[in-house]
Amino acid sequence: MPMYRSRTSTHGRNMAGARGLWRATGMTDGDFGKPIIAIVNSFTQFVPGHVHLKDLGQMVAREVEAAGGVAKEFNTIAVDDGIAMGHDGMLYSLPSREVIADSVEYMVNAHCADAMVCISNCDKITPGMLMAAMRLNIPAIFVSGGPMEAGKIDIADLEMTKIDLVDAMVAAANDKFTDEQVQHIEENACPTCGSCSGMFTANSMNCLAEALGLALPGNGSTLATHSDRKALFLEAGRRIVEITKRHYEGEEKGLLPREIATFEAFENAMSLDIAMGGSTNTVLHLLAIAHEGEVDFTMTDMDRLSRKVPCLCKVAPNTANVHMEDVHRAGGIFSILGELSRAGLLHDDCGTVHSASMGEAIAKWDIKVANNPEAESLFKAAPGGVRTTQAFSQSNRYKDLDTDREGGVIRSKEHAFSQDGGLAVLFGNIAEDGCIVKTAGVDASILQFTGTAHVCESQDDAVNNILTGKVKEGDVVVIRYEGPRGGPGMQEMLYPTSYLKSKGLGKACALLTDGRFSGGTSGLSIGHVSPEAAEGGTIGLVEDGDRIEIDIPNRRIHLAVSDEVLAARRAAQEAKGWHPAKPRKRKVSTALKAYAKLTTSAAKGAVRQV
């Protein structure tokens, strides 16, 4: 029988001092034999997706202790990408993922915890904790804070009734809106606690946690404000004790993160991502999580899946007026997984923390096939329509569910939005190791696009050039030296893409970068160009006026410059060093320098190489 890890610090004469300290935390003799469950929280008042998590850790802890475990809570950091956006704060976002993973490892291993419940929500917190779970490989269950309700608005010139923070950004840069209208949009864009309401990075990752098998059904789509979400937290507390005892005392196999999140589970997660048009950031994170679990899942696998998995669901920012609350009404993630399964595009035999197999879970939770009142009730959980920062503050329910798979929010393969999926990997001489585009957000008219390079040596330059009218129709805005090393930190480019839309160039220009994009990005926005400029990538050799050819259907991107000219440019660049031609006013701290020194390319998930 595997010995509880916690016995290292709770048993033996030599641990008298440690037990004395444990007693000072409230433990008694009867606790020194129970599994110690780490409650890994991420509460912060800086982030709306985490502002409501303060008391939820202790709520889970009470369930853990009632089920026979000992609960010990600690907190990680959490960066709000939306607040950090558009200034040097964004340099810290991606590196914070590694800090989160490390901090979880440090706390869990230093105190010999046996298992953990991870309470995450926003962009880098869920992937950071998933990386830690794969690294530690102890029983773990993920339960996120949930999505916020969509903003509701009625402005004549705005072609939508549901909005989010991206709409506020676009409106603010669009001169057709008055200051009063912009303020009205701003005030209504983010009405409640929770992760931003569209299929941005946070919600994408929380949905993928379901597909990986490490989160409970409803984790990705049940609103933060709805009382039904409370049940997920309570169930996580009870179930973690159950699977911990089954692993350590019953010697049962298939309960650890690496046994659940196998190569096939990563294929399931990526297939879901492609089917729902998730954030391109998920590519980075899935690669990093797989790396931590020693799962050989690569960009090549993603490319293979992207060629056969259809787009079954379009959510903001890929379409207007459809948000996570609408996905939930249509049956949530298990309804998308069910459609993938029926299309032969899912590994049904993968395990989960809640069911013996993914197929068994689909049979119970997919509203199209399940005769399950519990599932029907869960997916009728509706928004409350009241501004609040309180979790579980309302119990509204839809009168009916969206089960229309021909024209509804979730489609069957036969009625897919496109038979080509929502994410694609492109390769070419400007991106030998690949780059990523969210095809679900690209208008069909520009899936094939040839344009003229407009080179910017930083995101700041790009923003200035777009807002001052220097970027013209037909341009490919190239933003370089913003990769993991070059930034450092691989900034998100939400402002440039939003400003292109506000200037009416969303369908007339492309954007190409070795940086990355917010989950709120749409349009012909191609990121993660690898190798990055700072590593000697060809993107560093592009000059103003060069022709760039983008062919998404054929997964190709090409810089139309001869090999001889590129060789001459490379020799000249190597002579002066791979750095921006125009000096940047950017203070790089010691922490960021350390990150830049160790990080790898986006094609490898921007993980550290040590």
Curated annotation (Swiss-Prot):
According to its UniProt record, in which pathway does this protein act? Amino-acid biosynthesis; L-isoleucine biosynthesis; L-isoleucine from 2-oxobutanoate: step 3/4; Amino-acid biosynthesis; L-valine biosynthesis; L-valine from pyruvate: step 3/4
Alphabetically ordered keywords of this record: 2Fe-2S, Amino-acid biosynthesis, Branched-chain amino acid biosynthesis, Iron, Iron-sulfur, Lyase, Magnesium, Metal-binding
Its catalytic activity?
(2R)-2,3-dihydroxy-3-methylbutanoate = 3-methyl-2-oxobutanoate + H2O; (2R,3R)-2,3-dihydroxy-3-methylpentanoate = (S)-3-methyl-2-oxopentanoate + H2O
Q: Which GO terms describe its molecular function?
A: 2 iron, 2 sulfur cluster binding; dihydroxy-acid dehydratase activity; magnesium ion binding
Residues recorded as bearing N6-carboxylysine in the entry = 124
Catalytic residues at 518 (proton acceptor)
Entry EC no(s): 4.2.1.9
Needs which cofactor? [2Fe-2S] cluster; Mg(2+)
Gene Ontology cellular component list? cytosol
Q: Give me any GO biological process, just one.
A: L-valine biosynthetic process
Annotated positions binding Mg(2+): 81, 123-124, 492
Q: How is the cofactor bound?
A: Binds 1 [2Fe-2S] cluster per subunit. This cluster acts as a Lewis acid cofactor.
Q: How does it assemble?
A: Homodimer.
Alphabetized PANTHER family for the sequence: D-XYLONATE DEHYDRATASE (PTHR43661), D-XYLONATE DEHYDRATASE YAGF-RELATED (PTHR43661:SF3)
| Physiological role | Functions in the biosynthesis of branched-chain amino acids. Catalyzes the dehydration of (2R,3R)-2,3-dihydroxy-3-methylpentanoate (2,3-dihydroxy-3-methylvalerate) into 2-oxo-3-methylpentanoate (2-oxo-3-methylvalerate) and of (2R)-2,3-dihydroxy-3-methylbutanoate (2,3-dihydroxyisovalerate) into 2-oxo-3-methylbutanoate (2-oxoisovalerate), the penultimate precursor to L-isoleucine and L-valine, respectively.
User: What family does the database annotate?
Assistant: Belongs to the IlvD/Edd family.
For this entry, the protein name equals Dihydroxy-acid dehydratase
